[in-house]
Amino acid sequence: MDISNIDKNLIETLVRQIIEEKISGTKDTVDFVRNKDISGITSIKLPTVKVSESDRLDTGNPSDVVYTKDLFTLEESPRLGCGMMEMKETTFDWTLNYDEIDYVIDGTLDIIIDGRKVSASSGELIFIPKGSKIQFSVPDYARFIYVTYPADWASQN
């Protein structure tokens, strides 16, 4: 086994996380690497966040390729929602009954509103105000973080 490519920082983070869980008596049940202090302050290693079929968003069109994965529960962050979204060659309609900021990690995200397009690529973000009737559109691929207010965006009418 070639261990020369092992990320020492990742191993250190995992070991610290295991020790903290043992000390605090809690188990972090997420499937990505994060450092959660007992104060609630949390860091997440975004490259370790992976989406799967269980994270697929039902847009009403089975050919749409859209995945969302919340990074915090409502108990952990009752006011702000935050998650990872990945899309591939997809455009779908959406109405936001909440405020949202999308920070693009990889690829390009287009937001279409009233026939106009607002785009963001890697390292850029888009703010979408509450009440916007838009289309999320990705011509190729995009991976981005969404931050919503309020946190319980899915139940907003």
Swiss-Prot record:
GO BP term, example: ethanolamine catabolic process
Pfam families named in the record: EutQ
Cellular component, GO, one term: bacterial microcompartment
Assigned protein family: Belongs to the EutQ cupin-like family.
Protein name: Acetate kinase EutQ
Pathway the protein contributes to: Amine and polyamine degradation; ethanolamine degradation
Sample GO molecular function, one term: acetate kinase activity
Gene3D superfamilies, per the entry: Jelly Rolls
Subunit structure: Homodimer. May interact with EutM.
Keywords recorded for this protein, A-Z: Bacterial microcompartment, Kinase, Transferase
Coarse class of the protein's main subcellular location: other
Localization annotation: Bacterial microcompartment
Enzyme's top EC category: transferase
EC number(s) given by UniProt: 2.7.2.1
Catalysed reactions, as listed in the record: acetate + ATP = acetyl phosphate + ADP
Signal peptide: none
InterPro entries with a match to the protein in the record: EutQ (IPR010424), RmlC-like_jellyroll (IPR014710), RmlC_Cupin_sf (IPR011051)
Function: A bidirectional acetate kinase that may drive flux through the ethanolamine (EA) degradation pathway under anoxic conditions found when this bacteria infects the host intestine. It may generate ATP that can be used by other enzymes (EutA and EutT) in the eut pathway. Might serve as an assembly hub for bacterial microcompartment (BMC) shell proteins. Overexpression in E.coli leads to lamellar structures that inhibit cell division. Expression of the eut operon may allow this bacteria to use EA as a carbon, nitrogen and energy source.
